[in-house]
Amino acid sequence: MPQESPDDAGAGGPDRNRKVFLRGLKVLWVAMRGEPAVFGVAVFGASLHAAITVASSWVLGRITDQVILPAFADGRTTAAALTAAAAAMLAVGLFKAIGLALRRLYAGLMQFRMQARYRRAVARKYLRLPLSWHHRHPTGQLLSNANADVEAAWQPLAPLPMVVGSLFMLLIAAVAMLITDPVLALVGFVVFPLLFAINVVFQRKVSPVATRAQALRAQVSEVAHESFDGALVVKTLGREDTETERFTAAAHRLRDAQIRVGRMRGMFDPVMEALPNLGVLAVLLVGMWRLSTGAIDPGELVQMAYLFTLLSLPIRSFGWLLGDLPRSVVGWDRVQAVLAAKGAMPHGDGALGGTGGIRLATEGLSFSYEDGYTADGAGSDLADAPEAAGERARTTVLHDVDLEIAPGRTVAIVGPTGSGKSTLTTLLTRLVDPDAGTVRYDGADVRGLAKGAISGVAALVPQTTFVFEDTIRDNVALGADVSDDDVWAALRLARADSFVAALPAGLDTRLGERGTSLSGGQRQRLALARAVVRRPRLLILDDATSAVDPQVEAEILAGLRDTELAATVVVVAYRRATIELADEVVFLDRGTVTDRGTHDELLARSPGYERLVTAYERAAAERAAAAQTETFAETEEAAR
């Protein structure tokens, strides 16, 4: 999803401004086609307001001639004349209010409907795109696309009906002025084009600056989200000042761009305020001369002057619209870049029947990723590459992997860091598709299964657990139609029932953002309960119990084997106790299956496997010794 840098976004000239204007009109046309009825009511209200506004000047002129001047001349007026004048003014005010209410209400309705529609469209697209796409785009940028860019795209819809009504008003006003006095009409015909010319000049000047400001908004959002999301790393490494400076620099660039826009508006607005007033002055000067010659009467002069006064605000609406168009085009482009993004995986219409564990098989499975992305989320090895084909070198992470796992078996995937274990788990659940080869469930190619078929039978518990800011019940059920008994059963299987039962509100306990009120092991056990509550036929654990006490981990894995769940279990394992519980061990090294068998068989015949398991044990012993030393030191400190 390539998007302009802030500096590129600010570049431009007359040709670019013309293109921005034309493309802005196309964006508005999309909205008009999307909400024709609502737009029609808003334009009707704006046109009613415009027509009554022009009519009000005629009413004021008639009142001047028939009520005010006779009252000054004779010192009195009739009740009938006063009643008629009051009724006319009341009718004018009432119809103007109706038109204004319809215009504002339905313009807002149109704007907010389009924003909601495209926010939903962006969110749906995000959920359909594969992980590889998300790993290539910062979360802050995605948030900006769904919020600030959608708002900017449809910002011009607020003044749009007013602009259409203003065009109608100018047409009626021009006819009224020509009928009243062609000479005074010429004065207006000089002022109005000048106002339009100033609006066009302003739009050309402000367009590149407003475009750059919109791009900088996304940049600020990206930096802020990255800093907040990495708060733990920032604090532990003492990088608060560096991150503050980075955010400050981005915020200052946005501030400077917005100040430039403000300065331009500061020069533009006074001119737009002054010109209509100068037009009124010109009308009065020329009108006094015309009045002295008897060409017009006092009421017609009042009518013309009042009309000029009323037209200043509608004319300014053109400036508001033109000023919003550059940001609208930038927002629209960024939203469309998301909606047009490629990478969504095709699905077939196949279904999976049966019960019990899945027969899982892979045939010639190979996968490569774009350089700069890794499977742990620091980038991604899950590249879907159509967008970036040819732009990056690719590194093979899995090559010709063949597996056959019988239903109900537990298989441990063991291998050194970077051997492709996590990538394999994402391929097994079809979070990405392989470059070559096939993954089969009960003999069926997963690419031929209907959408939702895989998630209906398989569950993946990843390395990094995610806990929603919600209740424990909703975190475990996560939208599934399960009873509280099912939730408690899943919690017991994940050995999470004891700590949940100890909480004051039990299942109704609300967890903080990302489950910060829980320990790492508790979060992992909740994630495991979330997976097993759906009673999957295939359960994949990607180092999903690394933060759990080894004894508890052994109980969990033993429970998975003994339960009636009877799922096929694939576990990425690092602890010897975990590996020993598996029916079979697959040793993965440099993206290739180098050996497979029981734990004892691999220890006996695979030197690489033996070295790796020994290293795991040594690291575990060192961590245990360090924890024991820390506990002893804390006990001694407390005793003192």
List where the protein language model places each region.
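Helix-loop-helix
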Residues: 70, 176-190, 264-333, 338-339
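Transmembrane helices of ABC transporter permease
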Residues: 34, 38-48, 95, 161-212, ...
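Membrane-integrated ABC transporters
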Residues: 1-53, 68-85, 95, 103-107, ...
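Alpha-helical segments in transporter systems
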Residues: 37-58, 89, 154-166, 188-189, ...
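An intracellular "coupling" helix at the cytosolic face of ABC transporter transmembrane type-1 domains
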Residues: 30-36, 131-132, 148-160, 205-216, ...
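ABC-type nucleotide-binding domain
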Residues: 355-640
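Short intracellular "coupling" helices and adjacent cytoplasmic loop segments at the cytosolic face
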Residues: 4-16, 112, 120-144, 148-150, ...
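Juxtamembrane helix-loop junctions of ABC transporter transmembrane domains
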Residues: 11-21, 44-45, 52-65, 88, ...
